Amino acid sequence: MKVCTDACLFGAYTANTIKHSTSNLQKILDIGSGTGLLSLMLAQQIDAEIDAVEIDRAAFIQAKENFEASHWAFRLHIFNTDILNYTTGKKYDCIISNPPFFEDDLRSDDEARNAARHDTTLTLIQLLSAVNDHLSKEGFFFVLLPFHRVDFFEKESLAYHFHLNNKILIRHTATHPYFRAILVFSKSKLTETTTELIIKNENGVYTEEFVDLLRETYLQV
């Protein structure tokens, strides 16, 4: 499961937003953490306790190794379980998820890849239910979605009384259609904003906005 540009973008945006938030976000939950990329990106920039939940055994083992090899191992915790079975006595200030599925996209013959790219292990509605169970009253939920699932997700979120705060629509270039979106929800109603982020210019060079966003994560993009 290789690292994707949109996942790095999501991690950088989330870390930057939390870091500059006026809220005290000290307890973070990463749902469907995979090999731990997002948790590591947040731990690099935010002094918070991060719990990660990953159902796939191989990804869990890799994430555990990645966490233990990092400078922030004492703040990173990984659990090999289904988020629907995850129990804890705490409520989280922030929940992040890059859902391990892309509904309606082409399936592969590899079962592990299917589980990582499709709704075979967790549906969007189940994700919302899990977030509702674990998010604190004043907490925030960051999620990265395929663009074609955004309207559905926004509609379903209303059943859990989530309020959309920020929507970032992402496209490869100015002439490409949107392919991903970052959504930020809370249980409290705040001012909603929608912005656009373009990854590369017409010459195939990363845009200044993209580079600035990832600057604190990477020394060179």
Label each PLM-derived region with a short phrase.
Residues W72, L158-H161, T193:
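Short, structurally constrained coil/turn elements
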Residues T175-V221:
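SAM/dcSAM-binding transferase cores
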Residues V3, T121-Y178:
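Conserved Class I SAM-dependent methyltransferase catalytic core
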Residues A12-G89, C94-S97, E103-S108:
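Conserved SAM/SAH cofactor-binding pocket of Class I
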Residues P99-Q126, A130:
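Mobile active-site "lid"/loop adjacent to the S-adenosyl-L-methionine
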